[in-house]
Regions:
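Core AdoMet radical
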Residues: 1-10, 23-39, 53-81, 126-131
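Aromatic/hydrophobic pocket-lining residues that form the small-molecule binding cavity
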Residues: 13, 81, 109, 113, ...
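Acidic (Asp/Glu)-rich catalytic clusters
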Residues: 17-24, 44-54, 86-90
């Protein structure tokens, strides 16, 4: 996907990482990716870099619900998300692994947020970032919103859902973000 760090060729990524590490104030690398962008070359690069500096990989899962993933046009499945996390953890044991989730998809329920926490608990994840699904101007979602086909979660409902998620999340998983 365009705008995903790992969309570039691995050789280009490695070059960019090397340039970043030349700066004395850079203390590590945070790499954003998607489940469908994890290749053996990516794993090799992460493992190599993690031997030299702190490396965190942030995986944009967004949801474990297949219908919501299709609606979001993510192009990957929940099973691919789980597999990618497990691959990174196994191939790159020194890498700090985080996941991003978005709350507010159509027909999403509180029970789905609790289920997401349980699924994350079963994975080798170190941190999580939560996002509220919002409407951006000039997007297909903006058109759905304008036609009354999509309504974002109210702020209070979103934070209640976050609280439910957090109540079920393993206490050793750091929460890096509650809203974006």
């Amino acid at each position: 996907q365009a705008y995903t760090t790992t969309f570039a060729r691995t050789s280009k990524l490695r070059e960019q990482f090397e340039v970043a590490l030349e700066y004395p104030d850079v203390v590590g690398l945070v790499i954003g990716t998607r489940p469908d962008c994890v290749s053996q070359a990516f794993l090799d690069t992460c493992n190599e870099m993690s031997a030299r500096t702190f490396v965190s990989v942030e995986m944009g899962l967004q949801s474990f619900d297949e219908d919501i993933l299709v609606w979001m046009r993510r192009g990957h499945t929940a099973a691919q998300s789980i597999k990618a996390i497990e691959q990174i953890s196994k191939a790159c044991p020194a890498v700090n692994l985080g996941v991003h989730l978005i709350f507010g998809g159509p027909k999403e329920t509180d029970a789905m947020a609790i289920e997401a926490a349980h699924k994350i608990n079963a994975l080798p994840v170190h941190n999580v970032k939560l996002h509220h699904l919002h409407v951006l101007k000039d997007t297909p979602l903006a058109e759905e919103y304008a036609r009354g086909e999509f309504q974002p979660l109210e702020r209070e409902v979103y934070f209640q859902r976050c609280c439910l998620f957090l109540q079920h999340l393993r206490p050793d998983i750091a929460v890096h973000r509650l809203s974006a």
